Amino acid sequence: MTPRLFALIPCAGTGSRSGSAVPKQYRTLAGRALLHYTLAAFDACSEFAQTLVVLAPDDTHFDARRFAGLRFAVRRCGGASRQASVLNGLLGLAEFGAADHDWVLVHDAARPGITPELIRTLVATLKDDPVGGIVALPVADTLKRVPAGGDAIARTEPRDALWQAQTPQMFRIGMLRDAIQRAQREGHDLTDEASAIEWSGHTPRVVQGSLRNFKVTYPEDFALAEAILARAANAS
């Protein structure tokens, strides 16, 4: 049986570093909620069986009317960490008929620059891979190590083999669920899905990502994201 495709959008974070009064995924950029751009990109990929958005149980900011016309489901099963939210979302996908051998693409709600083309490139590259992988970019900047709490450079780190992880991250549902559960049992709270897969002894692949697919994190990121999204809208 051909594996199906599912998308999972963990959307339970508060965005504390963004300096916003509301969670950043609901901030308006170029006339739309930031989350809208992620949902629209996956909605444009009709090959996906379902896109599941994981909200915090007490989220009072989500308004489905802002995303009218887009195909997705919502479950209020977010946990205390990204890892917990993703695990709860993976378990929730069973409600939509997802099987262990099916693929899931986990994507940050705060990466509005994702495009259907990048999603399809990732899927086409990894659909026959035994493990899966992520979109990522080779590190371009020189990296300096600074001790925690300090402001003095300890050393310069070689960047030759370093890549900056992005999302989506694409893995088999069963493999990813088992990897996260193992990490939790062993007391590890990992910051992305590939880390859990690596922790289980597997080797994910990297697929070239895009600079426009950056994560909106700090206050100054909103203006850059808005400029990119507005330009894309004007070009279409």
UniProtKB/Swiss-Prot annotation:
Gene3D superfamilies: Spore Coat Polysaccharide Biosynthesis Protein SpsA, Chain A. Keywords: Isoprene biosynthesis, Nucleotidyltransferase, Transferase. The record marks R159, K215 as: Positions MEP for the nucleophilic attack. It catalyses: 2-C-methyl-D-erythritol 4-phosphate + CTP + H(+) = 4-CDP-2-C-methyl-D-erythritol + diphosphate. The keyword Signal does not apply. Coiled coil: none annotated. It comes from the Bacteria. PROSITE patterns: ISPD (PS01295). SUPFAM superfamilies: Nucleotide-diphospho-sugar transferases. Signal peptide: none annotated. GO terms for biological process: isopentenyl diphosphate biosynthetic process, methylerythritol 4-phosphate pathway. It is an enzyme of class 2 (transferase). GO terms for molecular function: 2-C-methyl-D-erythritol 4-phosphate cytidylyltransferase activity. The record marks R17, K24 as: Transition state stabilizer. Catalyzes the formation of 4-diphosphocytidyl-2-C-methyl-D-erythritol from CTP and 2-C-methyl-D-erythritol 4-phosphate (MEP). Belongs to the IspD/TarI cytidylyltransferase family. IspD subfamily. PANTHER family: 2-C-METHYL-D-ERYTHRITOL 4-PHOSPHATE CYTIDYLYLTRANSFERASE, CHLOROPLASTIC. HAMAP family: IspD (MF_00108). This is 2-C-methyl-D-erythritol 4-phosphate cytidylyltransferase. It comes from Burkholderia multivorans (strain ATCC 17616 / 249).
